[in-house]
Curated annotation (Swiss-Prot):
GO molecular function, one term: imidazoleglycerol-phosphate dehydratase activity
InterPro entries: IGPD_sf (IPR038494), ImidazoleglycerolP_deHydtase (IPR000807), ImidazoleglycerP_deHydtase_CS (IPR020565), Ribosomal_Su5_D2-typ_SF (IPR020568)
Localization per Swiss-Prot or TrEMBL: Cytoplasm
Gene name of the encoded protein: hisB
Protein known as: Imidazoleglycerol-phosphate dehydratase
Native organism: Streptococcus sanguinis (strain SK36)
Amino acid sequence: MRQAEIKRKTQETDIELAVNLDQQEPVAIETGVGFFDHMLTLFARHSRISLTVKAEGDLWVDSHHTVEDVGIVLGQALRQALGDKAGINRYGTSFVPMDETLGMASLDLSGRSYLVFEADFDNPKLGNFETELVEEFFQALAFNLQMNLHLKILHGKNSHHKAESLFKATGRALREAITINPEIHGVNSTKGLL
């Protein structure tokens, strides 16, 4: 079973997170940051994974530590659940429209961490979520999952739609990448290792 559970406690956050790559329930997100909960729920649904998150953070400061640390723990849990990555597609790409917005995510579960992020948000906050944290979350996720992740808003105006498009596209690209392909024997790399 491709699953993992991680608990991480620091001076700033206390996080319990569990993933299962081969089942879609439960999905239960509690971070104290409403918009972020909404985005993580979308991410889980579109990647078709089970994801539970309980996070307590220093929200009296702002939501930065909570969002970034959830990205760290989610990346670590996904990496652990993937194991040696034998048989997976490895690559995934998705374009997701959201009304006037079109977002793209393309990723490689290569073991090499990199993020290319091309998105601007006119609205600095969505609820108690600072829109600059979209990039911070994906940076933490990419570096801890050890994936190469390219995110881009091709066009759009609404900040909510832009963020939602990127979270959905990343979820859908991840589903493609983590899917076990019967035509792939061993690891999908000429190196024999990811």
